[in-house]
């Protein structure tokens, strides 16, 4: 077993180091950054435990707390976990300590942990607040908040008002101590779609209120531990269900390996449940005697949390891109995070104005999720660094008629035009994207957006970053492009018309297009006066005329005199 534990620790350490790189800060800056985040988390803790309020989403709090711990370890500071524990206004001792649960990084780590154990069961990791329920002589004698695991606050009066908690029990439960989760009741909660809804904070708020309102009936309880209870899990579940704790039996499943856990975890992630969850807990039926339970020392259970719907990511750099139309967009380069099995390292912020409204700088922590079609998006800026240096955006000198010809200032828009003309809906140049175009342009110094038509097989073969086998295919693609219809080439030149309007125009030659009048363009579908002015300006542009003449010299269909 020691060998397997060593392997497990090695894997966890490797994963931690691969995703959590230490910041390159001076000692002074590290102290400032850590102190600021520590103060903020302490403020959130005070709001949460003293007033039952939460100014931050549960998931954001958890991730920023983990980030603080990471920074503290990076710079040799103590983690001070006690700072994140609730203040003990009361000091009621738990009959049995709350151990907490160690989290597994992934399925591999879980598999290694399970390999050395038997009689294993999986339960949902219900998202609420932990509680101890003490029954004496068949009656609810005391309810204690988790607190620091050893002591908590007296919640007895509050819990007695929660109708979902049995006030009387019998049989083996008559004199028992139970541990569980007070949760917010939900009807058909689908975790994948609805997320955490800040359930933990909402429960804490209800439990902290001074008034004993009917809203406590919106709470339920999920018992996940019966210290010193029956040895067989099936017996435990049966007795709990008979007493009224039916959810425990319904949502506790026997499992033999990590594959089975993964299937249950995925099912609970996607199906309707009566509570919010943030993962699953795998536990061995065999537990030590309760007198040996201590916070942080439970070896008989582990958690495998869901990947958060939104992840906190550090902004590593701010980059500017110029699109084919000349619009400047801003992109944030991120320390990699995983979202729904997708590694995210970049997120589009939008326009320069939007970036300025977000006020994002390198070193900030932003909340990122996936929008439709798996596209990363920014949900919020959750933490701003102490030192914030924002880059200066490029001058807004570009428009839809600039950068058909290469120049130093036109680098980004020029590349964007190449990417556009190579796309499936234009010339359909398979096998080349932005990186390939950059390599070709840097090596062969294109004059304009169609210069690639002159490249020889030898030139393509000698282009850095393009394999010999791929260079032959690319040359073939470039030659096939010569056979594309006239309208595709006009689209590649950036005519400000939709494909439908262009096809309806029935233009089949460059000379005919140049002679078309304003009245002709106005007859096309979806072409208003503003669009017509853009077309006239486009076809009269000197760069466009020069490109048309060049394509005629290359005998491209529709451009020949």
Curated annotation (Swiss-Prot):
Transmembrane segments: none annotated. It catalyses: NAD(+) + (deoxyribonucleotide)n-3'-hydroxyl + 5'-phospho-(deoxyribonucleotide)m = (deoxyribonucleotide)n+m + AMP + beta-nicotinamide D-nucleotide. It is an enzyme of class 6 (ligase). GO terms for biological process: DNA repair; DNA replication. InterPro entries: DNA_ligase_AS (IPR018239), DNA_ligase_B (IPR020923), DNA_ligase_CS (IPR033136), DNAligase_adenylation (IPR013839), DNAligase_N (IPR013840), NA-bd_OB-fold (IPR012340), NAD_dep_DNA_ligaseB (IPR050326), NAD_DNA_ligase_OB (IPR004150). SUPFAM superfamilies: DNA ligase/mRNA capping enzyme, catalytic domain, Nucleic acid-binding proteins, RuvA domain 2-like. The active site is at residue 125. Keywords: DNA damage, DNA repair, DNA replication, Ligase, NAD. GO terms for molecular function: DNA ligase (NAD+) activity. It holds the Pfam family DNA_ligase_OB. Its EC number is 6.5.1.2. SMART domains: LIGANc. Catalyzes the formation of phosphodiester linkages between 5'-phosphoryl and 3'-hydroxyl groups in double-stranded DNA using NAD as a coenzyme and as the energy source for the reaction. Belongs to the NAD-dependent DNA ligase family. LigB subfamily. This is DNA ligase B. The lineage of its organism: Bacteria, Pseudomonadati, Pseudomonadota, Gammaproteobacteria, Enterobacterales.
